[in-house]
């Protein structure tokens, strides 16, 4: 199916769209809820109120991907950055308003978070189909899954029924999202704070098998990793030389580099294979193979067993997607994802 065809389908009755036509064949992993705090979430939440919701989302994700393959990683990243700040409540999508400062202004998001226009477009289509029904938080969970699938990764049932926050937390976004230079212990502490464990950490960082990083995100590894003008000794020298050609010691801050230089747009296990060969782009990636025997063994296992990685990734995505959801009468269903309803 070409891009023109997908565009023409976006506005028609999407309940008849075949998932096989839009997405590559994939393995769907069954996952299960395990805590009472998310018992009100269900894969069938919109079965009666908006039965075409998932087909609409899938169609628009496909269109966005065909227009810009980078978008898959970008909208997946929004879900991560949302869930790590006061739970999966779509607070990352809110623009600044009045005294509320947007999470988009944090170091983790400023000049790098993207895909907001795609979310706006999908939300508009959902509002036309089922007004004030599908939350922006659920939309982020769905686009994350569909972005993985369209890149060749695993699928899973997305539990739905989240509601949207009325507030953003710039401070939370500054404090709770790991940086490219974070130590393994710092990253693990942040994951543990969200109820995620070491297994989840290693699996979820595998999402870096797609996407990009700016030069500014890893330059220190190339030239001054220890603070003594020395490069990172855990970085393959040939790979480092290649990176230095496009990421000099100064300038070119915004130059983009693939997180996985072998299969940059395919969701597979090459992320782990690269780490084994000391060709992880970010310091916060390579440390999985260099700072802990336990994580090293997991990296080697996933490098050799893509199916095991896919299965654990799906489980960990469900677990992450269930972090502190607003349900029942908490929060609201935003009509526009960038603004709370009283500002619309």
Curated annotation (Swiss-Prot):
Q: Which gene encodes it?
A: PER36
Print the keywords alphabetically. Calcium, Disulfide bond, Glycoprotein, Heme, Hydrogen peroxide, Iron, Metal-binding, Oxidoreductase, Peroxidase, Secreted, Signal
Q: What is this protein called?
A: Peroxidase 36
UniProt enzyme class: oxidoreductase
Task: Relay the record's extra comment.
Answer: There are 73 peroxidase genes in A.thaliana.
Q: What does this protein do?
A: Removal of H(2)O(2), oxidation of toxic reductants, biosynthesis and degradation of lignin, suberization, auxin catabolism, response to environmental stresses such as wounding, pathogen attack and oxidative stress. These functions might be dependent on each isozyme/isoform in each plant tissue.
Recorded E.C. number(s)? 1.11.1.7
Disulfide connectivity for this sequence is: 50-130, 83-88, 136-337, 215-247
């Amino acid at each position: 199916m070409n891009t023109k065809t997908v565009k023409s389908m976006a506005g028609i009755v999407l309940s008849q769209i075949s998932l096989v036509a839009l997405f590559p064949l994939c393995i769907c992993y069954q996952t299960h809820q395990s805590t009472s705090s998310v018992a009100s979430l269900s894969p069938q939440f919109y079965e009666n109120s908006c039965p075409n919701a998932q087909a609409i989302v899938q169609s628009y994700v496909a269109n966005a991907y065909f227009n810009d393959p980078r978008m898959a990683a970008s909208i997946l990243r929004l879900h991560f950055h949302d869930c790590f700040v006061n739970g999966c409540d779509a607070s990352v999508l809110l623009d600044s308003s009045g005294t509320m400062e947007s999470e988009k202004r944090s170091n983790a998001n400023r000049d790098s978070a993207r895909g907001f226009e795609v979310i706006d477009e999908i939300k508009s289509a959902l509002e036309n189909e089922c007004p004030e029904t599908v939350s922006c938080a659920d939309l982020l969970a769905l686009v994350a899954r569909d972005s993985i699938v369209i890149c060749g990764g695993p699928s899973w049932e997305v539990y739905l029924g989240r509601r949207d926050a009325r507030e953003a937390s710039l401070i939370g976004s500054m404090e709770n999202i790991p940086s490219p230079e974070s130590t393994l212990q710092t990253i693990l502490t942040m994951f543990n704070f969200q109820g995620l464990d070491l297994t989840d950490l290693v699996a979820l960082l595998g999402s870096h098998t797609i996407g990009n990083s700016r030069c500014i995100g890893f330059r220190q590894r190339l030239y001054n990793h220890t603070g003594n003008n020395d490069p990172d000794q855990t970085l393959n020298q040939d790979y480092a030389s290649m990176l230095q050609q496009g990421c000099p010691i100064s300038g070119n801050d915004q130059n983009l580099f693939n997180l996985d230089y072998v299969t940059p747009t395919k969701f597979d296990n090459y992320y782990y294979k690269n780490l084994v060969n000391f060709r992880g782009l970010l310091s916060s990636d390579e440390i999985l193979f260099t700072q802990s025997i336990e994580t090293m063994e997991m990296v080697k296992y996933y490098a050799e067993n893509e199916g095991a990685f896919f299965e654990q990734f799906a489980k960990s995505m469900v677990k992450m997607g269930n972090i502190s959801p607003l349900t029942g009468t908490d929060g609201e269903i935003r009509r526009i994802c960038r603004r709370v309803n009283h500002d619309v």
